[in-house]
């Protein structure tokens, strides 16, 4: 298995390709080429959408140096996508900070993961995982004698403890966890929402859906959780401040045995 890691977007990216081998004496030129392309795309998206960079396009929009109407077509399309998710979640997910600044970090990381998976598929790889700060998408199998990919979910109160392990498969290959474990507090609660959950994990058919809905659950609390489990075919597990776990039936079906 080829394993490649690098830092970007304030977190760690880990790519595992079960179809390839990388080492000091054996190399896979196809894997090396696509991994370089993936790093480049992550860097490009970070340079374009990071509000921590003064030279990013999104920062220029935030400062008013350019209007949204004059921004690149790609940025406007990503903003439109985020607005669609705000509509689908009744506002629990939003591309706006409390001060009104457009912040697309809630979708861009997932966009980068999705792009990496497409690049790997286009390069001919079938069995791989792309993990970015605990959010991941998978394809195929982890090993010849394994079905799907097994991944753990950490305890938000003790990062050295795994509270559950699930098997991602062809129907539900993507998983995202929101809360304060991997990257600190970064989600804005609705004014009327108490902090019902300190962590939410969503498993879905694609990483963008998983990431957005996990964020929405943290932001919107129990009411949003109920809405999502009724309206979306996703697996969900939440952790309350007192450590109580909630998992819907679909999540329980994916728990690794």
Question: Which residue ranges define each predicted feature?
Answer:
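Mature catalytic core of soluble alpha/beta enzymes
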Residues: 1-257
């Amino acid at each position: 298995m080829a394993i490649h890691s690098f830092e970007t977007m304030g977190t760690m990216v880990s790519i595992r390709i079960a179809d390839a081998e990388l080492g000091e004496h054996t190399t896979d030129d196809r894997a090396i080429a696509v991994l370089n392309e993936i790093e480049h795309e992550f860097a490009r998206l970070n340079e374009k959408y990071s509000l921590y960079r003064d030279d990013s396009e999104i920062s220029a929009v935030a400062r008013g140096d350019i209007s949204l109407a004059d921004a690149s077509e790609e940025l406007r399309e990503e903003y439109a996508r985020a607005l669609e998710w705000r509509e689908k979640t009744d506002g629990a997910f939003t591309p706006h900070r409390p001060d009104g600044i457009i912040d697309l970090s809630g979708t861009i990381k997932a966009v980068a993961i999705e792009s990496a998976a497409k690049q790997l598929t286009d390069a001919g790889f079938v069995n791989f995982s792309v993990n970015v700060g605990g959010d991941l998408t998978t394809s195929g199998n982890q090993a010849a004698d394994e079905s799907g990919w097994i991944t753990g979910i950490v305890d938000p109160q003790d990062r050295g403890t795994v509270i559950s392990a699930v098997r991602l498969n062809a129907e539900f290959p993507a998983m995202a966890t929101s809360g304060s474990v991997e990257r600190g507090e970064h989600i804005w609660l609705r004014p009327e929402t108490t902090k019902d959950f300190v962590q939410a994990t969503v498993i879905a058919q694609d990483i963008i859906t998983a990431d957005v809905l996990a964020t929405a659950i943290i932001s919107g609390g129990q009411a949003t959780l109920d809405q999502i489990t009724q309206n979306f075919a996703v697996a969900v597990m939440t952790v309350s401040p007192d450590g109580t776990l909630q998992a819907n039936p679909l999540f329980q079906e994916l728990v690794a045995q």
